[in-house]
Amino acid sequence: MNYKILYPEAFPVVEMQLNRGESIKAESDAMIAMSSEVDVEGIMEGGVLGGIARRMLTDESFFLQRMTAKRGNGTVLFGHALPGGIMDVDLDGSYGLIVQKGGFLAATEGIEIETKMQGLMQGLFSQEGFFLVRMKGRGTCFGSNTHWFRIYFCSAAGFAEFH
């Protein structure tokens, strides 16, 4: 799997080259185009309750899209509707990534996406709200890199803002 971020300054697009059998999951409105070798299916990451929590609490989609290259190597283009960049972050399993609601765009198959609730004081006084999106596992995550969204690394040692 190879990718590159096209037009990084204005309305960026991620061009993902999938080898046969590889897949990527993304927000339901993130895919712009795909080649004929790629199939799309709707999935509920985290089951029904995970989908409900993601939709009701974080403004993310109830369903995610899984795009799989089934008939040979394929290409998928995805992006978001907001102006600003797209950030790619590789996770190795030793830490996770937390983004504000609306900040998740796509991830490779080794990444789990879940809703995380902040504590009462953090939820009241932070600009992020009570619920965030957490990504963990091994793989690559793609998220919005605009001034509206903050990205945090999380591990057993705590949180650190990512710039």
Give residue spans per PLM region.
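Composition-driven recognition of glycine/serine/threonine/acidic- and proline-rich low-complexity segments
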Residues: 1-163
